[in-house]
A protein has these predicted regions:
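Active-site rim/loop-helix segments in enzyme catalytic domains that contact anionic ligands
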Residues: 11, 20-142, 266, 274-275
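Internal alpha/beta domain cores that form substrate/cofactor-binding pockets in large enzymes
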Residues: 70, 114-196, 204
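Short helix-coil transition/hinge motifs at the ends and kinks of transmembrane helices
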Residues: 85-91, 181, 251-255
């Protein structure tokens, strides 16, 4: 109960202060109906800003619910995702990496997640067997209840699907009894692909809409940490509003729940349930 009350106190800071009393009450009731427990989640991000744009709301929301959320950034996006920094002149790759590291750490702290960096490079992102084993070891350590990563296809950025395949292959290795025998293996956490920049070209179709209204302000604060990609701030604000409208429509426009902002995900594996409601 102490943990639940602490979560609710934190939640108050994340909610808008005017015009959302009904939303606040509904969200508090939802938090109270999900007891805080030792649960965890893993986010595998190709570049150091991807987890913020595409899953920042999910991270903040589950952190509020008591999940330990851990982010793995495979690269800093130092070559292909830091144009604004390079245009300043007199920049080096190491200097760009340092800026990107600090941005991602600040964003993760706002969202309530821990973060680590594999620093395997970008444009192109490439991974050897040791990198795969390193990620499998993260799975073993975190024991995630669910995983968030990139779409399986992205013709605009080959780093993204490679990150997705790494996340899934490492999951399989972490499930194998013969990999580091004696360690606790990973179960079968569901994997959700977060929204790519241009979903129509990525064969990505959402089947999960997540209400992130209660944590939107936190997500936008995290977005603003990404100074190297300021041109994307308002784009992802529009995406969140659009997904919020769609989420509201999918629960029925007469529903009392006031959804404003949302995130969308595509599940890879079937959901196993005892209740279809």
């Amino acid at each position: 109960n102490i943990n639940k009350n602490h979560s609710l106190r934190k939640l108050t800071n994340y909610l808008p202060t005017t015009g959302h009393d009904k939303l606040k009450k509904t969200t508090e009731e939802a938090i109270m109906s999900h007891p805080v427990s030792e649960k965890s989640a893993l986010v595998v991000s190709a570049h150091s800003a991807d987890f913020v744009w595409r899953a920042g709301g999910a991270i903040a929301l589950h952190a509020l619910q008591g999940y330990q959320v851990h982010v793995v950034c495979l690269s800093f996006g130092e070559r292909g995702e830091s144009a604004k920094l390079w245009r300043k002149g007199n920049m080096t790759e190491e200097a760009v990496k340092q800026v990107r590291r600090e941005e991602a750490q600040a964003a993760a702290a706002i969202l309530g997640a821990s973060v680590e960096f594999f620093d395997i490079g970008d444009y192109p992102l490439r991974a050897d067997k040791e990198t795969l084993f390193r990620l499998a070891d993260v799975y073993r350590r975190i024991q995630p209840h669910f995983v968030l990563t990139h779409s399986l296809h992205d013709p605009y950025n080959y780093d993204h699907p490679l990150a997705s395949h790494l996340a899934q292959e490492a999951r399989i290795i972490a499930q194998a009894e013969g990999y580091r025998p004696g360690e606790k293996i990973v179960a079968a956490p569901p994997v959700y692909c977060f929204e790519p920049h241009q979903p129509e070209q990525c064969n990505w179709k959402p089947d999960v809409l997540l209400d992130i209204t209660a944590v939107w302000e936190k997500k936008y604060q995290a977005i603003q940490c990404m100074q190297g990609q300021e041109h994307l701030w308002e784009y992802y604000t529009r995406v969140a509003l659009q997904r919020g409208v769609q989420a509201k429509r999918n629960i029925g426009i007469t529903a009392a729940r006031d959804i404003v902002h949302g995130e969308a995900f595509q599940s890879i594996f079937p959901r196993v349930t005892e209740n279809l409601a």
